[in-house]
Structures are given as C-alpha cells and as structure tokens.
Amino acid sequence: MSGFYHKHFLKLLDFTPAELNSLLQLAAKLKADKKSGKEEAKLTGKNIALIFEKDSTRTRCSFEVAAYDQGARVTYLGPSGSQIGHKESIKDTARVLGRMYDGIQYRGYGQEIVETLAEYAGVPVWNGLTNEFHPTQLLADLLTMQEHLPGKAFNEMTLVYAGDARNNMGNSMLEAAALTGLGLRLVAPQACWPEAALVTECRALAQQNGGNITLTEDVAQGVEGADFIYTDVWVSMGEAKEKWAERIALLRDYQVNNKMMQLTGNPEVKFLHCLPAFHDDQTTLGKKMAEEFGLHGGMEVTDEVFESAASIVFDQAENRMHTIKAVMVATLSK
C-alpha cells in the first residue's frame, strides 16, 4: 500500500484518518479473501520476530496465523527467550534483529521500549501492546464495529468504555476516537480517567472529525443511547493482592451487567471485550475473586451478558488476526 511501506505501527496517532481507514479497508479485503479461498500471499520469504515480554494468546496466535497465511516465517521470543534489556540493551537487540528479520513485533512494558526498537532496527516494528497503548486491539475493534453497524460512519456511532480507563485500552480508544470521529464516552471513577493532556489532544482532533469525547462518573448518563459497551479486566495476576480489594471497591458499580445494557435504551446494543474476561469462576483468578470478594457470576462483566446474543467478543478476537495481517502486509509489501 502506498505510503505504508516500511512504516512502523507504534500508536494510532502516528497515522492520519485516511491512513487508518485504508488499513481497515485492507483488513476487510484480506478477511473476505481468506474466507473465499482467494487470499494471495504477499509476504513469501519474509522473516518476522515476535518479542513477547508479556505472554498472550490472541496477539501471538494472530501474528503467527496472519504471517503463515501470507507466506512468512516467524520466530517467537518469549519472556525467557531473549536477553532484551537484561544482558543486551534494547538498542543492540534492535540492531541485531534488524539484520536478520524483515519485521519485529513487540509486546511488553514501556512505550519507550518499542520506540527504541523502531529507532534502531531499520525494519518495521509493530506494537502488540505496551503499558501505554494497544493499537492493534483498536484496529480489530473498529473493524468489528463497522461489521455490526454497516453503512454507518464512525461519527454516527457511540462507544462506551466502562471501568478502568487509565490503561492502554483507554489511551488507544482516545486515539481511535480522535482519528475517526467516533463518539466515545469513558464511564469510570475520576481516579480511573486517562491523563488530561491526552484527553485534551484527542478531544480536539475528534471534534475536527465530527466526533465527541466525554468522560463521566455517571453510569446512567454515560451509557444512554450507546451502540457498544466495552470493558476490560479490573485486576491481573501480576498485581499485588492488596490492590485487588481497592480496585474492586472502586469499580464495582461499573460492572457491565443486564441493568447497564438496559440503561442504554438500545435493544440492539452490543458488548465488546478485548479478552481474557473474568465472567465466571472457571479460571484461577475468577475462583479467587468469587471466594474472596463474592464476585460470583463475573467481575468486570457478568456471565449473563458475556454469553448473551449482544456479545460480539469472539468476532473481535477473530478480527485481531485480520487487522494484524493488514498491518504486516501494508508495511512489508510494496
């Protein structure tokens, strides 16, 4: 694709609205081609390094399947499979991998790490997730929303994110809304709002693109008329146990449940989640939450909503692969 060749994919605001739209169009085409058996391999002979300082199911599988579909080969470097930042600097790692690979994916910690990789690798670098941003997830989310509201422009849609909005998902949603004009409402306790500077920047851009960004603590007001309600986990296994009670007390009123879905007043409202979700007690963490905090039947989302017809979370999960494929094809093929 013109203009994308050898570009990095580090955060959404590195792109223009037109470029973002082009990536979504390419993803939709690649998805249709795969389904119809007409996919054309554009990455034959390419070698791709996947650096994972944080484990992941969806991100790893998406990159691997997308690469294989397109004829590329991958090397997985897991949390214990490389010396990045420990025995070898990020700068040196970038220069080594850049001599061997045609593209590098990084999923891990600070945004400065993926930025340094991009500065020194000499090949396209893609952000699979950092503490600050999760751009590949938002590409999948935008494609999923387009599929479920065909014919509607993003500035005619309303997305609500309920819960902890100060994380990489909240930041990337702000950037997505800025570029698309998507009506975005972050419904969260004020302590869980993103940094004011990013909100201000993205709100100004969103208004230029016909959209609006709202932050509110009021659940009923925030979800009214929503087309999509989105949430993410409140706690993770890596966090100190003392944080769990504090986080749950802060966010309990922002659980996505049938009452919240009904408060939208939209019988066609859809539920989104980037996964994994703690919607039951069938996981180690889910059991702990149920036993210690009485969160039976779900934490950030109830099992009832997660398993309902309104839930399109597995469409999202599939679209991770198609949109990641679009990023690789756009940046590695002329």
UniProtKB/Swiss-Prot annotation:
EC number(s) recorded for this UniProt protein: 2.1.3.3
GO biological process, one term: L-arginine biosynthetic process
Record: residues binding carbamoyl phosphate: S56, T57, R58, T59, Q83, R107, H134, P135, T136, Q137, C274, L275, R320
Catalytic activity from the UniProt record: carbamoyl phosphate + L-ornithine = L-citrulline + phosphate + H(+)
Keyword Amino-acid biosynthesis tagged: yes
Alphabetical keyword list: Amino-acid biosynthesis, Arginine biosynthesis, Cytoplasm, Transferase
Family classification: Belongs to the aspartate/ornithine carbamoyltransferase superfamily. OTCase family.
Protein function: Reversibly catalyzes the transfer of the carbamoyl group from carbamoyl phosphate (CP) to the N(epsilon) atom of ornithine (ORN) to produce L-citrulline.
Cross-referenced HAMAP family: OTCase (MF_01109)
Protein's name in the database: Ornithine carbamoyltransferase
Organism: Shigella dysenteriae serotype 1 (strain Sd197)
